[in-house]
Amino acid sequence: ETMITDRSADSLSSGGDNDIVIEILKAGWSVGYFPELSLVHIIPQERLQISYFARLIKDTNKSWVQVLEKHQINPWHKISSWTVPLRKAKSWFKIAAWKNKINYLNWKAACGYYEGLSK
């Protein structure tokens, strides 16, 4: 039995799509990538803000690690939860998150991985 993980409440986690694909593969089916297909996605203005992208990337990375863990295909070692704030602080400086928006988003992505890997 599996529980598909996806967005709920204020969380922007989006592991549901990946979870579905992994379940399809485990059931013996095939999946495909078709670059000639296109999709028009109408996005509200508030979702084009750095603050939204920061939450989205953090929650997406956290849920991705959790989906991999659930399916026992996570290539990374779990980390102690008490180390997460220290790792985030170290990454803030290593990535220089204060310098520009891209660095800040990269830092938020790292934060999501740490949260997903914590026990």
Predicted features along the sequence, with ranges:
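Acidic donor-binding loop at a coil-to-helix junction in glycosyltransferase catalytic cores
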Residues: 3-20
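Short, flexible active-site loops
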Residues: 3-8, 38-46
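C-terminal catalytic/acceptor-binding lobe
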Residues: 19, 42, 46-70, 83
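Hydrophobic residues within well-ordered alpha-helices
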Residues: 24-25
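Catalytic beta-strand/loop signature of glycosyltransferases that borders the donor
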Residues: 28-43, 53
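Non-catalytic, C-terminal membrane-associated alpha-helical segments of glycosyltransferases
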Residues: 55-62, 73-119
